[in-house]
């Protein structure tokens, strides 16, 4: 039996008491009120970190709204792929997680860059302020938006049976044909009563219309524009290199950051010593393999720079500075090779060195020996003498503690950029 999504309903329309609103979000909403602009929360959780809080605002007000929210501690993320949305992010005051405000100057029917419905002004005019001081879209409009959103999220996004009043039924009929709103309301009622067959059939007909795709030339032009972040507002991303011997927890940290950071994350491998068993014979000719590796590293670092330009956080899984850590006295040829590798890629904003005793790293992964791992540990720590942007993190902590510490480092580094 299909029922309305309680989480969706609570997040979109639940008011609750003022203490249920996160203090950083309350400050942001107070800043909007102080501006005197119209705004309305569309969906999102207000009482906890994590997830986006979608807020409707007029496009003409964005120029004033964004600086006002920045003044409360948010930072605008550069996100060309999400335009015309504006994404603002902050680490919450207690350093327990992230908050994201997604400002919507248009109402997209079926997800990002889908067909827009010209009802935003009407929704703002009909919005209601709750006992907690938060302005939300009216309940009737909320149920219609949830039905339309089902083309993107599925029938589980329903919050109630839409009623045939307000601006949205007419907008639905204008886009999907006369009678579509009535059919949608009836199908939603049946779905919430336990039979969603009619709703699923209706959504199959609605989806291609609401997700209207531009022509191939327009799509290709948009991809190029997004990749170059052409005239995209917001702050560019940052790059962190995650370093440490085997068993320090590099992979676990990178995967955890990719899952938890609300900024788009790109992972690039810039290690220099990984062997390739499928390497063709011609690459084993002296000098050829090195040239291929240098070109590969340069290409990966160039893509990483583009990712940063687009506002993404780049995580380097290892880095070419590993060339400094080779033990023993290298030959002249090796010194030349290591020097070329070392200068093949720019340094990241921060080197994160995961530090743990050799015995602990051996116990975790069982590779090499405790003595070898301890020697490599010391070589990584020596990077502090060469670079002033090395941060050593205690990797004897549990994985979640390490991740939270580095999340805070990401925030401090990114929010300090100009």
Language-model-derived ranges and their functions:
Residues 321-382, 391, 396:
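A glycine- and Lys/Arg-enriched "phosphate-lid" helix/loop adjacent to the NTP-binding pocket
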Residues 209-216, 366-418:
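NTP-dependent small-molecule kinase module
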Residues 245:
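P-loop (Walker A) phosphate-binding loop of NTP-binding proteins
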Residues 258-298:
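Conserved substrate/cofactor phosphate-moiety recognition/catalytic segment
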Residues 253:
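Hydrophobic positions on the alpha1 helix immediately C-terminal to the Walker A/P-loop
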Residues 286-345:
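Glycine-rich phosphate-binding loop used to anchor ATP phosphates in small-molecule kinases
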Residues 250:
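Conserved lysine of the Walker
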Residues 2-238:
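Conserved NTP-donor binding/palm subdomain of two-metal-ion nucleotidyltransferases/polymerases, i.e.
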């Amino acid at each position: 039996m299909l029922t309305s999504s309680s989480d969706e309903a609570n997040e979109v329309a639940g008011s609750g008491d003022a203490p249920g609103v996160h203090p950083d979000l309350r400050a942001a909403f107070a800043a909007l009120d102080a501006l005197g602009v119209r705004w309305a929360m569309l969906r999102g959780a207000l009482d906890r970190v994590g997830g986006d809080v979608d807020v409707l605002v007029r496009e003409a007000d964005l120029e004033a709204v964004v600086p006002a929210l920045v003044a409360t501690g948010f930072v605008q993320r550069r996100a060309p792929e999400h335009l015309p949305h504006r994404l603002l992010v902050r680490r919450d005051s207690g350093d327990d997680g992230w908050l994201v405000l997604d400002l919507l100057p248009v109402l997209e029917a079926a997800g990002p860059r889908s067909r827009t419905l010209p009802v935003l002004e009407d929704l703002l005019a009909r919005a209601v302020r709750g006992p907690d001081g938060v302005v939300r879209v009216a309940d009737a409009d909320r149920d219609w938006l949830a039905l339309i959103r089902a083309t993107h999220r599925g029938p589980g996004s329903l919050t109630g049976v839409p009623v045939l009043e307000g601006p949205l039924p007419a907008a639905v009929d204008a886009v999907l044909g006369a009678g579509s709103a009535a059919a949608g309301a009836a199908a939603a009622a049946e779905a919430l009563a336990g039979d969603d067959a009619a709703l699923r059939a209706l959504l199959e007909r609605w989806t291609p219309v609401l997700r209207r795709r531009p022509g191939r030339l327009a799509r290709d032009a948009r991809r190029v524009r997004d990749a170059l972040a052409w005239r995209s507002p917001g702050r560019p991303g940052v790059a962190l290199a995650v370093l440490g011997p085997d068993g320090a927890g590099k992979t676990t940290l990178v995967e955890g950051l990719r899952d938890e950071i609300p900024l788009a994350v790109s992972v690039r491998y810039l290690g220099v010593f990984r062997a390739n068993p499928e390497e063709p014979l011609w690459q084993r000719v002296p000098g050829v393999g090195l040239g291929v590796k240098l070109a590969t590293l340069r290409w990966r670092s160039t893509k990483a720079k583009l990712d940063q330009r687009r506002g993404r956080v780049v995580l380097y899984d290892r880095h070419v500075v590993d060339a400094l850590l080779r033990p023993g006295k290298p030959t002249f040829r090796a010194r030349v090779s290591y020097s070329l590798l070392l200068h093949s890629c720019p340094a990241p904003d921060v080197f994160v060195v995961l530090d743990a005793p050799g015995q602990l790293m051996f116990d975790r992964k069982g590779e090499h020996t405790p003595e070898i791992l301890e020697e490599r540990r010391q070589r990584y720590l020596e990077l502090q003498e060469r670079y002033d942007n090395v941060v050593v993190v205690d990797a004897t902590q549990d994985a979640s503690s390490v991740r939270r510490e580095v999340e805070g480092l990401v925030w401090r580094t990114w929010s300090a950029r100009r």
